[in-house]
A protein has these predicted regions:
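Soluble metallo-hydrolase cores and metallopeptidase-like ectodomains found primarily
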Residues: 26-28, 105-112, 116-149, 153, ...
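N-terminal hydrophobic or amphipathic helices/low-complexity stretches enriched
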Residues: 22-80, 249-253, 257, 313, ...
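Active-site-adjacent substrate-binding region
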Residues: 191, 197, 202, 267, ...
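Acidic/histidine-rich catalytic neighborhood of metal-dependent amide-processing enzymes
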Residues: 179-185, 189, 205-206, 326-427, ...
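Bacterial Sec-dependent N-terminal signal peptides
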Residues: 1-27
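Metal-dependent peptidase/peptidase-like ectodomains
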Residues: 112-113, 228-262, 375-474
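Extracellular/luminal Protease-associated
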Residues: 114-233, 305, 337-340, 344
């Protein structure tokens, strides 16, 4: 009797599971039919139209794009978050003031260096004056797992730190220092060691052009557009310190000659042993004068609450950036001057809208919650996605996956790239499985584009991701990236694959492997 009840219970459970799977399949089938080349084309034709003037951040054209996306989310029945479909992203523009100075005093003899030829502030520099002793901290790297620390044996606290660009053994194909090469990392590391300012020199051993670059401030370059001011994210501006790029003149003063510095680098490269040192009898006085103005732009968000009592607190993010690079202020009469950005990234934004609509039309709601985000300011430095992960609308630790669409409308009609797919093997496997009846030849690429789109911000917060990407083309960031060049059939097929992948993830209870960012 008990055995009969047991088998009856199993039969009922299997029937329920079968019905649930049937409902789910019907729901996804209806959603797939909602994604058509015609709908993709309609979205792209508006977002990449001349009227929006390239959707620069910030601009009236970009505001129009945000309004279009907002209206679509409202039409699809997606919910706002915290009462709004707009999530503000505070940006700061920075221009260079008049009073910028760099003085070097060697045993009582002072030399004034010249802005532009000898030093140029970076756009991420703070404004202010500092004076103090100098420490040379090599490449500015602390890599305990490699047994390498440029700060070993020196005290940078309260001093001005001098560092090289790039990393030891730059030509080594293993690239073991790759993740330590960025200026952002080096400045953060210098601040951790208590410095008051940072001077950056181009590595002369592997690079011929040693003149300072910093930022191409319009006041320093006659042919540079006056509107081309530096843009940074307000939330990252709190930890700024004076930061300038210096040239050969300071190398000669501090090292005797450029060749002497090259010899020092060669020793570091050969032995992987830092040659950092504190200078005695040498002080530097630095003044950086920058002027900041605050700007407003927004990510556009739409939300579908999960249906499962336990899983609804977990979140799947589906994203695409909706900004582009604007238009040329100076141009000849009759020539094209608008960077329409049809593929980059009106195509991905259109895919985002298509997937959002498909989800909304489903009568079966996902178990996990889903947040659709159209990111702003990707072209300026991934600022929209950075702002989100710094101030997330939902607990970041509950975000199980981020699916990103960037440039999904060009290239071979049968080929799809999953960028850096090996870093999220479980999600990549799901996408490959869901592709079975769509039929792309999927290429799981390396990490070349990992930090070039919005998935990067999530990856560096240890969130598994997929970047759906159709590939680069000669019209990338040119005035030729136009709506008529888009393969809307391919874009719609990629959007269907994103839908299927997102649906599977949103109805799963698993957590996915990530080869983590350190």
């Amino acid at each position: 009797m008990y055995l009969r009840k047991f088998f009856l219970l199993i039969a009922v459970s299997l029937t329920v599971l079968s019905l649930q799977n049937s409902w789910s399949q019907k729901a996804i089938a209806k959603g797939l039919k909602e994604i058509t080349p015609e709908k993709i084309k309609t979205h792209i034709n508006y977002l990449a139209s001349d009227a929006l003037l390239g959707r620069d951040t910030p601009s009236p054209g970009q505001d129009s794009a945000a309004s279009y996306i907002t209206k679509a989310f409202v039409q699809y029945g997606l919910a706002p978050v915290n009462g709004s479909y707009l999530a503000p992203v505070p940006l700061i523009t920075t221009s260079l003031g008049d009073d910028n100075q760099l003085e070097v005093t060697v045993r009582g003899v002072t030399k004034n260096l010249n802005i532009k030829t000898d030093f140029i502030p970076f756009e991420t520099s703070s404004s202010g004056s500092i004076e103090g002793n100098v420490v040379f901290a090599g490449y500015g790297i602390t890599a305990p797992e490699l047994g390498y620390n440029d700060y070993f044996g020196i005290d940078a606290k309260g001093k001005i730190v001098l560092i090289l660009t790039h990393a030891p053994r730059e030509k080594d194909t293993t690239k073991i220092f790759n993740k330590y090469k960025s200026l952002a990392y080096k400045v953060k590391n210098a601040i951790t060691h208590g410095c008051t300012g940072v001077l950056v020199m181009t590595d002369p051993l592997n690079h011929m052009i040693l003149s300072p670059k910093g930022f191409p401030w319009p006041t320093l370059y006659k042919n540079f557009p006056k509107e081309a001011v530096a843009l940074t994210l307000k939330d990252t501006a709190q930890k700024k310190i004076p930061l300038v790029h210096v040239g050969k003149e300071l190398m000669n003063i501090l090292f005797g000659s450029v060749d002497s510095l090259k010899s020092l680098e060669t020793l570091i490269d050969n032995e992987l042993k830092p040659r950092s040192k504190e200078y005695t009898g040498i002080t530097i006085k630095l003044r950086v004068n920058t002027i900041e103005n605050r700007l407003k732009t927004s990510n556009v968000v739409g939300y579908i609450a999960g249906s499962d009592p336990k899983l609804k607190d977990e979140l799947v993010v589906v994203g695409a950036h909706y900004d582009h690079v604007g238009f040329m202020k100076q141009h000849k009469e009759g020539e094209r001057y608008i960077f329409n950005g049809a593929d980059d990234n009106a195509s991905g934004t259109s895919g985002l809208l298509a997937v959002a609509e498909a989800f909304s039309k489903s009568k079966v709601k996902p178990k996990r919650s889903v947040l659709f985000i159209a990111f702003t300011a990707e072209e300026k430095g991934l600022y929209g996605s950075q702002a989100y992960v710094q101030n997330p609308l939902f607990t970041l630790s509950n975000t199980v996956a981020m699916l990103n669409m960037d440039m999904i409308g060009r290239g071979n009609p049968d080929t799809l790239h999953l960028e850096a797919g090996a870093l999220s093997p479980d999600l990549t496997a799901i996408a490959q499985k869901e592709n079975a009846d769509i039929g792309f030849r999927i290429q799981v690429d390396g990490t070349e584009f990992l930090d070039r789109s919005d998935q990067s911000s999530f990856y560096h917060k240890n969130i598994p991701f997929i970047m759906f990407f159709a590939g680069l083309h000669p019209d990338y960031h040119t005035v030729r990236d136009l709506p008529e060049t888009i393969d809307t059939l391919k874009a719609s097929k990629i959007a269907r694959l994103v839908l299927k992948t997102a649906w599977t993830v949103a109805n799963d209870d698993k957590h996915y492997k990530l080869i983590e960012s350190k």
